[in-house]
UniProtKB/Swiss-Prot annotation:
Its cofactor is Mn(2+); Mg(2+). This is Ribonuclease HII. Endonuclease that specifically degrades the RNA of RNA-DNA hybrids. NCBIfam families: PRK00015.1-3 (NF000595), PRK00015.1-4 (NF000596).
């Protein structure tokens, strides 16, 4: 899987001149569930106030922006990689695959793809696309580029909702509170109740719990 060198922040203004797709992920660290990615093409004629890294926003603010993004964006697509794919590929490659899926699912072709972080997959030859798309990684892009901020928010809200649904099915694990991250409460639930099908079997705390069965 191709990886490209991250660009400097000085180049951001040039790259955001066209109808680019901002891409970000949520859920690399949790022990359970999908890694969720979003690709968003914003409408430059419909600016959205308050976009920022989703981790710096309250849940209420994220939900409000989530609605506004869906009302104003030109295109939005979600890409997933399942726990099984994470276990098979590793979390990095599964995340890259999910990003490819998100971009491939867009209703329109972006002029380029800007990804939060220090690496990006090759969006020209993903499993569902043969588009010739230039991509760039932008370190801390979710706080610098509006489209990446929007993708961060969309992915965060989607994944949090998934965890809320999983919490309804398995309330004893407390997923609505810790969202699947490796917290003390999650470790205690794993020890007491065991591993669920949705858990990532390759992650050490889960693997160690399975070894005790």
């Amino acid at each position: 899987m191709a990886v490209f060198k991250a660009i400097t922040t000085e180049q951001v203004e040039i790259l955001t001149a066209g109808l680019y797709a901002g891409v970000d992920e949520v859920g690399r660290g949790p022990l359970v569930g999908n890694v969720v990615t979003a690709a968003v093409i914003l409408d430059p004629t419909k600016p959205i106030t308050g976009l920022n890294d989703s981790k710096k926003l309250s849940e209420k603010k994220r939900e409000a922006l989530f609605t506004e993004i869906h009302e104003k964006a030109l295109a939005i697509s979600i890409g997933y990689a399942s726990p099984e794919e994470i276990d098979e590929l590793n979390i990095l490659h599964a995340t890259m695959l999910a990003m490819q899926r998100a971009v491939a699912g867009l209703d329109m072709a972006p002029t380029s793809v800007l990804v939060d972080g220090n690496r990006t997959p090759d969006f020209s030859h993903g499993e569902d696309t043969d588009r010739n798309i230039e991509s760039h990684a932008i370190i801390k892009g979710d706080g610098l580029v509006a489209g990446i901020s929007a993708a961060s928010i969309v992915a965060k809200v989607i994944r949090d909702r998934e965890m809320d649904l999983l919490d309804m099915e398995h309330p004893q694990y407390g997923f609505a509170k810790h969202k699947g991250y490796p917290t003390k409460a999650h470790f205690e639930a794993l020890a007491l109740h065991g591993v669920l099908p949705e858990h990532r079997k390759s992650f050490r705390p889960v693997k160690e719990r399975l070894a005790k069965n």
